[in-house]
Structure formats: C-alpha cells, structure tokens
C-alpha cells in the first residue's frame, strides 16, 4: 500500500512528469574504514558479477511428451493432462500447446518432477494448480526445462478464473531441484502462488510482462541462481498484509541465500509488508530498474489510475474498466485495485491501478458489487464509452448520479523530489512496513529510490505501516535517481558497509540513527536528511565511520529539520559551499550537540556545535586543497585522518580528544595547514552561523513528496 500527495491545478490532479535519465556515472562511492580515527575513504564499489544467462536453446527437448506416476492419478483430454491425487509425477518431453492441471484434494501434496520437459500453451496457464494442499515443482539434476505462456492480449482480472501466470498455483508452491527451469510469459506473471511461494537450489530464469515472481502471501528465496526479468511490472511482489489462521504475518519477501538478479521495469522487489534479507547461504542480490534493466520496456503508459473521491469508494463495491476497440473484437475487463492514496490539498482520493497493453483505443467504467464479475449488464453504475487519452495517466471520477459515472482525464505526478526519477514507482526495494537487512551483498541501480519503506498506510492486519529501514549487516552499494535509502519512519544503521554511490538525497528518514558500520554517501541535494514525519526529526550518530559528500552550491551534506546529536564515531562532511543560510556542511533547524566521537565538517558553515559540546575548532578563510589530511596533537599522534577530493575555504572540527590548553595541527601531505592552541570550548573563527535549517518534508523543497 502506498501514498501519493498531489496538487490540484486547473481542475486536474497533477503528478509532475519526470523523465528517466541515467545517473552520473562519474561519481565514485566511498567505503568507510573501521578505525575511529579515520574517515571513510573514497573508492570504487562494484556489484557482484551478474549471473550468466542459463538459456540454451540447443538443450530444449524435442522428445515425445510423457507423464508417469507410481502412486498418483492422472488423466488426459487431448493435450491437457489433469492430476487429481497426491503423489509424484515425472514429466518429460515436449508438450506443445498443452497444459498440466492439478486439481487434487485440499490436503494433497503433489510433486511435479521435471525431467527435460518443454511445455507451451497459447490459451491458458501451462502449469495450472487449481486445488491442492501444496505443490512442489522440482527440476531433476542436470535437466533443462522450459515453461512458456504464449497467450496474448494481457491478463484480465475480471474473475477468480483468471490464471494469470505461466506457472499458477492456488495453494502453496515450492520450486526446487538442481536442474534448470526457464519460464516465459508474454501474458502476465511468470510464477504465481495465491499463497506462499518459495525457491530453493534451482537455476531459474523468469521473463514476464507482469511480475516475475508473485506470492500473494509471501515469497521466500533460500538458495539457487535466479535471473528474474519483468518487462512492464515488478520483479518480486507480494500482495496480502493480514495474519493467517496460524498467526503468520502475510506479505513478506525473504531472501536468505543464493544469487538473485532482478531486472524490472517498475520495482525490483515490492513487498506488501516486509522485505528481509540475510546471509544464511551466501546471499547475493543485484537489482536493476527501468533504464538500468536492459530487457525492460518503459512502464509509463502501461499502469493507469482511476481516481475515486472517498465519498464514492466502498469495499462493498469494485470498479472495473472495459478496454475495447471499434472493430467489434472482444475487449478485456480489468479490475481496478487499490494502490495508493492521493491528496489534493486536504481532499483525499483513492487511487486504483489497472494495467493496459496500450493496444486499446476505447474504454468504459463499471461499478459492481464486490465479488461480481462484470458482464456489461450487471453494474450498479457505468460510464458511456470514450476514447483513451494517451497523454494522461489517470481518470478522475467527478460524480455518480442515476447510475452514470462521469469524470475527466487528469495527469498524476509526484510534484517533488528529483526530476530525473521516473513518474511511476521504479524502486530497488519497496516495502509497506519495514526493510530489514542483516547480511548479504546487495547492489541496487534504481531510477527511483534505492530502498524505500512506506509508513502510515493502513494494513490488513489492523496496524499502520511503520516505514522503517534497519541495516545491521551486509554490504550495500546503491545508485539511485532519487533517495538512496528512504524511510518514512526510522532509518537505523547498526553495522555493515553501506555505499550510496549516487543519489538525489542519500539517506532520508524522519528519525535517523547510526550506531555503527562503514558508510559513505553522495547526494546531489542533501547527503543525509532527517525530515518531517510522525515524530520530531532527529539525526543521531553513536558510532561507525561515515563520509557524506555533496557537490558545491545550494546543497547540505547533513540536513535535519530537528536536532543533530553525536555521541561517537568518525564523521567527515564534504558539503555545499554556501554559508549562513540554507546550504552548507551541516544545516539544522534545532541544535548540534557533539558529546563524543570525531567530526570534521568542510563547506559552508550554517551551524556549529552548541555550548556544552566537546571542544570545537572553527576555520573560515583558510584554503583547504584536495589531498590527504592528518589531525595531530602536540606529540605527533594522529587523532583523525581523511581525504578531501576538492577544495574548501571553511570548516569546523569537533573532537572529544581536544583538551583545553593543548596544541594541535592539521597537516596536508606533511605540510601544516592549521595550528592552534585550544583555549576555549570554541576556538578559531567566530560569527553568527544560524541558518534556516532543513528544506521541508520528504523528497524535497517544501512538503511531502509523492512516494509510492
């Protein structure tokens, strides 16, 4: 579940159009050093090598098709083979335009053993599980198997009988085995379970128009080599957020091992509840969205929205769109599903999403009782047919009167954030509650936020999404067109290596806490931004090694709409060049309190640590050229070392090791640049460094940004 905030201009809901552009590839990340006397050092960060495409047409079987079992029950009707009992079924050979159907008992466990099988279908899901307790699809050792859904026209959600995946299961589905499975869907999803979906050991390649992997209740990847491509939707997706009868929370995506490479037109991982990544089995995750995903097509124009005033929305009714052409050929009914909240000023609207292939020129809307499949006559209200407006991405219902739906086309956009980001959601990892990373090697290339946790939206379990991101281990490298890591709630880094290589705003959250880890951040607006939310904005650094870099000009390396507190760690700030206003090295609305650790802040001076902080030295007007620096005491002991990659003319340094009456030097490549005796709590240049503080809410300059 997601939340949009929009502006009402000239009678239309506007979401600013944003062209996807490749991020500046010349910016290099910094990898932090663990020593408390050393700042994070700049170095190139590269992802783990992508998987080799396992597709091998020469291995695809042309043998005669067979399905055998010793303890089950299977029948054939033409090229459709139906399994009706628990057991193991070995499937091999080529089944052209055929289908494997499982329609067994509620508690039956069915295993499909793929032994060099090739299954294609142009009319339905090639592997369809209508009913069973649990189904396992296993690839036998060293075998090569393909499942191809060759239906055309795009999926319709008009009824429960829409089996919208190449491998579709109405029950728990497990994919396992030490062979290879190639899944292709030109229709919609690649592999889908209405319940839980898990993958273990298998070499799996999925290419789909819709989601590559979808488990309505959960998706779990334990091991294997997975190459997942969605050319017009998400890579991995979950849908439900309620609690099962056994007390299990639904909606989580879990990755604990193997290598997972995802290429997605929209979000690489989209969880209705949590995303949890650990390193139980050498976990590697490489994520690419939109223009970074070479096989994806532009998603703009494929996902459309129906905007419904809250007074015209009820869970007792459902909206459908009928897409058709004037040639009298059969059209398609598509269900409009809740996707987001849209706000115009203080007016709330429900944003319902539907997907169209773009091949239809006309549409009409139907409102039907919940659970009813529309047929064009059983509606409560309907619109007259009209032409699709290809230049707009949403239709706003303005009234329903005497059974007639009326409205107009509008354009949705985020209205804030980076203009290089996409107009639709194209995040690396997105969760409606929390993102929890305890291990693994994770690389993200996203034309939107790298990691994003939504907060505040109502979940089906009765709670509101927390919007938290917690990193306690692993290695992350993030290149993003908007925020590197965004948390509507709390962003906490306890350990691990985090490199935000390129971003609009590097780390953004309501409450940001850094307890440890090796962290480097580059943001072309703010490096770190503690911004408005449900709690008072706060940035706290208790430990770790951190380097934050922003380009010269109107930028803040550290920006807090509240306070900034530091009790430990080593921090190097390389910020904007303006001073005494809204840009610089550290810019806060409240106060800066440094009670421990080391921080050197280069760039425009907006604020300095408050009285009662550790001793601070301030320099204004000194030339600090690019190079390697060491801060030493009178005995020559190195207290702090760091590197500047460009020149600065002002800085402040706060250090718990500064002692009143003691002398210190700052040396560049062995040459003294500064020397002083610390005779007071604040030594060196003085002045009123007040400043205006933070730049507004999430995503940019003034108010909440459009976040999906």
For every predicted segment, state its role.
Residues 4-14, 18-300, 414-708:
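A composition-driven surface/loop motif
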Residues 211, 288-421:
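Insoluble glucan recognition modules
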């Amino acid at each position: 579940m997601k939340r949009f905030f929009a502006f009402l201009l000239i009678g239309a809901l506007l979401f600013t159009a944003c062209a996807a552009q490749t991020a500046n590839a010349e910016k290099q990340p910094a990898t932090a050093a663990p020593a408390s006397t050393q700042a994070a050092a700049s170095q190139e960060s590269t992802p783990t090598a992508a998987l080799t495409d396992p597709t091998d047409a020469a291995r695809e079987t042309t043998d005669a098709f067979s399905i055998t079992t010793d303890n089950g029950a299977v029948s054939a009707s033409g090229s459709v083979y139906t399994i009706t009992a628990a057991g193991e079924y070995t499937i091999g050979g080529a089944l052209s335009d055929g289908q494997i159907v499982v329609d067994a008992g509620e508690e039956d466990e069915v295993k499909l053993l793929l032994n060099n099988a090739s299954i294609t279908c142009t009319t339905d899901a090639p592997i369809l599980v209508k009913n069973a307790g649990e189904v396992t699809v296993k690839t036998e050792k060293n075998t090569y198997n393909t499942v191809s859904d060759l239906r055309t026209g795009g999926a319709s959600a008009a009824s429960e009988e829409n089996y919208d995946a190449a491998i579709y299961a109405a029950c728990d589905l497990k994919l396992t085995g030490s062979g290879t499975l190639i899944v292709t869907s030109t229709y919609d999803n690649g592999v889908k379970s209405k319940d839980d979906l898990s993958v273990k050991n298998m070499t799996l390649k999925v290419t789909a128009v819709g989601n590559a992997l979808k488990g309505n209740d959960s998706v779990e990847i334990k091991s294997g080599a997975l190459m997942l491509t969605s050319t017009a939707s998400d890579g991995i997706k979950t849908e439900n957020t309620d609690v099962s009868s056994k007390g299990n929370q639904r909606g989580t995506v879990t990755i604990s091992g193997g290598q997972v490479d995802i290429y997605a037109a929209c979000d690489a991982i989209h969880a209705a509840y949590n995303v949890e990544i650990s390193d139980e089995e050498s976990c590697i995750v490489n994520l690419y969205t939109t223009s970074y995903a070479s096989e994806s097509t532009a998603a703009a124009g494929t996902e459309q929205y129906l905007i419904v005033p809250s007074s015209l929305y009820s869970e007792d009714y459902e909206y459908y769109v009928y897409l058709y052409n004037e040639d009298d050929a059969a059209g398609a009914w598509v269900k409009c599903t809740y996707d987001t909240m849209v706000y115009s000023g203080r007016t709330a609207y429900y944003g319902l999403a539907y997907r169209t292939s773009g091949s239809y020129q006309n549409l009409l809307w139907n409102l039907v009782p919940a659970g009813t499949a529309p047929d064009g006559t059983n509606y409560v209200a309907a619109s007259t047919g009209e032409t699709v407006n290809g230049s707009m991405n949403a239709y706003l219902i303005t009234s329903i009167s005497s059974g007639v739906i009326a409205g107009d086309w509008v354009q949705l956009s985020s209205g804030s954030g980076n203009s290089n980001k996409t107009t639709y959601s194209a995040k690396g990892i997105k969760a409606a509650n929390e993102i929890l990373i305890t291990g693994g090697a994770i690389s993200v290339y996203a034309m939107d936020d790298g990691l994003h946790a939504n907060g505040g939206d109502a979940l089906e379990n009765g709670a509101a999404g927390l919007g938290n991101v917690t990193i306690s281990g692993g290695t992350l490298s993030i290149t993003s067109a908007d925020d590197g890591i965004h948390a509507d709630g709390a962003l906490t880094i306890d350990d691990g290596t985090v490199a935000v290589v390129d971003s609009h705003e590097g780390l953004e959250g309501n409450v940001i806490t850094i307890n440890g880890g090796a962290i480097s951040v580059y943001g072309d607006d703010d490096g770190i931004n503690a911004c408005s939310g449900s709690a008072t904005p706060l940035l706290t650094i208790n430990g770790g090694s951190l380097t934050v870099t922003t380009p010269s000009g109107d930028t803040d390396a550290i920006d807090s709409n509240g306070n900034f507190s530091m009790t430990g760690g080593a921090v190097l700030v390389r910020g904007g060049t303006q001073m005494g206003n809204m840009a610089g090295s550290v810019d806060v609305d409240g106060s800066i309190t440094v009670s421990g650790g080391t921080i050197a802040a280069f760039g425009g001076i907006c604020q300095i640590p408050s009285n009662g902080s550790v001793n601070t030295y301030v320099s204004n007007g000194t030339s600090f050229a690019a190079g390697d620096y060491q801060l030493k005491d009178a005995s020559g002991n190195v207290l702090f070392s760091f590197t500047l990659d460009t020149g600065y003319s002002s800085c402040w340094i706060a250090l718990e090791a500064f002692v009143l009456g003691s002398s210190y030097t700052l040396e560049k490549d062995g040459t003294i640049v500064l020397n002083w005796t610390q005779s007071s709590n604040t030594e060196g240049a003085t002045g009123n460094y007040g400043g205006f503080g933070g730049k507004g809410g999430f995503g940019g300059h003034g108010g909440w940004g459009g976040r999906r």
